[in-house]
């Protein structure tokens, strides 16, 4: 992991098209602004993990349903 030090209103650039700016610092909380193309999805990690878990759960349900449908079809 690359660790960088930035102060309020300072930025980093990723891949020529993503800019991350430190907007505010209050105690242990840091507010950041992200300027990126609309085609790039940006999520807080906890939300991303929830989405991944829901997608995995949905895929498992579909697989179970498909197996049952195939069993019924082959009868």
Swiss-Prot record:
GO terms under cellular component: cytosol
NCBIfam families registered for this protein in UniProt: csrA (TIGR00202), PRK01712.1 (NF002469)
Function: A translational regulator that binds mRNA to regulate translation initiation and/or mRNA stability. Usually binds in the 5'-UTR at or near the Shine-Dalgarno sequence preventing ribosome-binding, thus repressing translation. Its main target seems to be the major flagellin gene, while its function is anatagonized by FliW.
Protein location: Cytoplasm
Entries under InterPro entries matching the protein: CsrA (IPR003751), CsrA_sf (IPR036107)
Name of this chain's protein: Translational regulator CsrA
Transmembrane segments: none
Lineage of producing organism: Bacteria, Bacillati, Bacillota, Clostridia, Eubacteriales
Entry-linked HAMAP family: CsrA (MF_00167)
Keyword annotations of the record: Bacterial flagellum biogenesis, Cytoplasm, Repressor, RNA-binding, Translation regulation
Assigned protein family: Belongs to the CsrA/RsmA family.
Coarse class of the protein's main subcellular location: cytoplasm
Subunit structure: Homodimer; the beta-strands of each monomer intercalate to form a hydrophobic core, while the alpha-helices form wings that extend away from the core.
Pfam families from the UniProt entry: CsrA
């Amino acid at each position: 992991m690359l660790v960088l030090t930035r102060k309020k209103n300072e930025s980093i650039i990723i891949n020529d098209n993503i800019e991350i700016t430190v907007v505010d610092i209050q105690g242990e909380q840091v507010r950041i602004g992200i300027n990126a193309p609309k085609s790039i999805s940006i999520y807080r990690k906890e939300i991303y993990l929830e989405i991944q878990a829901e997608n995995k759960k949905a895929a498992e349900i579909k697989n179970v349903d498909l197996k049952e449908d195939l069993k019924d079809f082959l009868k």
